[in-house]
Amino acid sequence: MKKIALLVFSAVLVAIAACTKENTSEVTFAGIEVEVGENNGNFSKLYILNEGAYPGASTLDLLDFKNKKYCTDIFAQANPEVVQGLGNTANDMAVADGKLWVLLNASNQVAVLHLPDAKLEKVLEVDSPRFIVNEGKYAYITSYAGAVYGSEDMVPGKVYRIDRTSYAVSTVEVGYQPEGLAVLNGKLYVANSGGYNWVHDNRISVIDLSTFTVERTIEAPVTNLFQMCVASGKVWVSSYGESTWTQDSQGDWIQSVSAPQSLTSVNPDGTCQILDGVHADKMTLCGKTIYCFGNDDEMTGGYNLCLYKVDTENSNFQKTGFAGSDLSRVAYPYGILVNPDNGDIYICDASFTAGSKVHCFNASLKHKWTVDTGVGTGHLLLQ
């Protein structure tokens, strides 16, 4: 899995993706008929965000459950006058107040779209936006703040606080290359990755939302922090782990893993606990259960892709290997979302050279359907 943050997909989220319902005004987009079954819970739409081939154009697609139709690039359909399209290297999206916020990393922008018609309402300038969470009247967005991979300059990241009505912006400085963020008890927790630095970051910045200042930092027991969520009174943070790359005599690059991908719980008092046996690459939260996938054999040099279901109440987890199950349909998992109404699991199967796919599995991990999507599919959101 890629460690360089610009090539990462999340959220996740950790994007992590949202499970919220919108108004039901009928809007028609051009699309093709698809077979997605009858039972999709109470949701009528699945928004699908394609990153594009880096640094190519990102697109927003729509899977219309009600009309069994797949609609490609609905942003272009809704905004033909915007000739440059949605933007480049989409990294996360979230819905609030009937609007879809799309973070465009390589474009240094956040596009705010009205729903359900996907009309562009506002473009905000944010340096390398990464992840978004909404709390109260504000959107909070992590930003690399202009950091450049390979540069000797250590540029701290920022969190942007944006008023969702006036679009007024405030910022606060955090750690290096911040990624996921989550809110617990009036505090905003920020996962700092340090992904552009030779020594990765292990700090979690804790921001008091009432003052929008960093009140403390927590030293996590792992580095290269990535996605975040809140469940069972704790913050949960994933890590990309640590690895080095060397060239062999034939010039091929060989990866050596020194620390695995992981999932760590963080208590409000700052104490942390690594959940042994869970290798979390991308994750999503549904209820009190974290769903994530990763390579279970990465420390031994093998490749055993597994899906983990983590009960955040007691930290017990179930593990299912992709090989030998219906999950084997997935070639390159790049994003995940769970339907809270029926337990369906949606997994992005990304390609950065051609079209990707989204696979749907029921709660028993039996395949239900697959749809063809755009290039670099990595982010999903139910409405």
PLM feature segments, named:
Residues 5-13:
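Sec-dependent N-terminal signal peptides
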Residues 15-18:
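C-terminal motif of bacterial Sec signal peptides marking the signal peptidase cleavage site
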Residues 1-4, 21:
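Positively charged n-region of N-terminal signal peptides that target proteins for export
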Residues 3-6, 369:
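Short, basic/polar N-terminal leader/transit segment immediately after the initiator methionine
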Residues 20-383:
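Predominantly soluble domains enriched in secretory-pathway, periplasmic, or organellar proteins
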